[in-house]
């Protein structure tokens, strides 16, 4: 029910069909109940890929800075939820929280941009999608069952830093993302899993 389609592009088919940062989608699904976008970079906010998953009654959850782009694209304002970091929300009966996603030792994702990761609760399971981030004071406090974390380095945590974060927050399952397309390799994902505490199950879900 959970797929990493490419890079940081995730599809969850549970009580709702949810996409996070659809990117390089290779077919027309057009079945999204909710689309979550973490931030305004081409490999996370891709209008071409949104078109492949959106349907008539899809809700799109975005950071505030993306509102003008979506409205210009012709998306109905009533179908858009804008979010800020460190808040709790509800969309189509689904609870979610926003966790700040930013760099601490590089400049690609400034904290002041208000970009986010998401903690989404589905069937009483909390899924944390970290977004493009380093280890931060906020994400070190995240409580979740399943965590999707970037391991590719350069713009985000590398595999060692990602493992450090996961070993601290201790989800049941950890899934490496943000590699294999723009930056990072499958080896980064494999090395990440090797560094996890034995109590945490690391799973590679990347399709390509």
Briefly describe each language-model feature range:
Residues 1-30, 81-143, 157, 206-208:
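Core dinuclear metal-dependent hydrolase active-site scaffold
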